[in-house]
Amino acid sequence: MNVPMLDLSEQYEQLKPEIMRVLDEVMRSSRFILGDYVKKLEADIAAYSRAKHGIGCGNGSDAIHIALQAAGVGPGDEVITTAFTFFATAGSIARAGAKPVFVDIDPVTFNIDPAQVEAAVTEKTKAIIPVHLYGQMADMEAIAAIAKRHGLVVIEDAAQAIGAKYNGKCVGELGTAATYSFFPTKNLGAYGDGGMIITNDDELAEKCRVIRVHGSKPKYYHHVLGYNSRLDEMQAAILSVKFPHLDRWTEQRRKHAATYTRLLEEAVGDLVVTPKEVDGRYHVFHQYTIRAPKRDELQAFLKEQGIATMVYYPLPLHLQPVFASLGYKEGQLPEAEKAAKEALSLPMFPELKEEQQQYVVEKIAEFYRHFA
């Protein structure tokens, strides 16, 4: 049996007639940039997130960059973020001209540790970027309290967490703004790149809208240095077809996560550490990520059995060569470094079959019986 990490083909076949219809509508309209589908998606995602504004942009990385610039973050500023996430989070800070300050994670959730955030605040700190990794929100009440005490901006990186909740609060409700990615692998994915900023701050939203179109307002009159980063109409049309299915897909992911946890506990006990949904959180399981001893050997074995897995992420950001000038050393952020050696994400997508999950777990158990 072959089990892919992600299979978008079944989803496409289910939605194909409607996707073809909206794409044809866009083609016939000849309105490809910031058209009606972009406006509709912005309104729908904002309402879904209980936000006043949605600002579509080219991708999730640009969403972070634009939000930072709109919030006034720039050269000389420090932005505190997690060392254990995708590069775009820190790359966007650096692109804004600011200095990323990396802190360690909570080993249970893989998310940023608020106590470490508090300790990292200096007079140069301008913002905090918590990342809601794998689909579970960070401890936003604690982070929001730190931000309030120190007068800081909070930009939530929710690339993996659309639909997640914290004590009933949506992504973005406890921060200054939040950013989404619509990369094809995301829970709500386009057939190309796409991103969005959501916020309840009217001034910030308007600045984001200006920055995404070369900093022009009105057209051809430029008061700030902006970028060309717009969510195109065809991607917005595709996302508008997918969006009504998002909650159902999330429930399927949560069901698959519960199945994995049950099967793994039955098969290998505490040999691997399964994901924990913290009380008060609603985890959307963009990834189902275990901690596995002999992780690399297990991954190689599963590959031989036709099972795809991924390591998110093999090298923490504070040890990335591009950030060597910041002076971080190995051992400085031990939980992030430990996670990078142990984390393994198993196949996860709404259409995943239970027999596929059973096969995955059987092979994990076989590995630990014979090779560990």
UniProtKB/Swiss-Prot annotation:
Its main location: membrane. InterPro entries: DegT/StrS_aminotransferase, PyrdxlP-dep_Trfase, PyrdxlP-dep_Trfase_major, PyrdxlP-dep_Trfase_small. Residues 160-179 bind DNA. Keywords: Cell membrane, DNA-binding, Membrane, Pyridoxal phosphate, Transcription, Transcription regulation, Two-component regulatory system. One of its GO terms (molecular function) is DNA binding. It holds the Pfam family DegT_DnrJ_EryC1. It comes from the Bacteria. Residues 53-158 are annotated as: Hydrophobic. This membrane protein may function as a sensor protein and may transfer the signal of environmental stimuli to the regulatory region of target genes to activate or repress transcription of the genes. This is Pleiotropic regulatory protein. It comes from Geobacillus stearothermophilus.
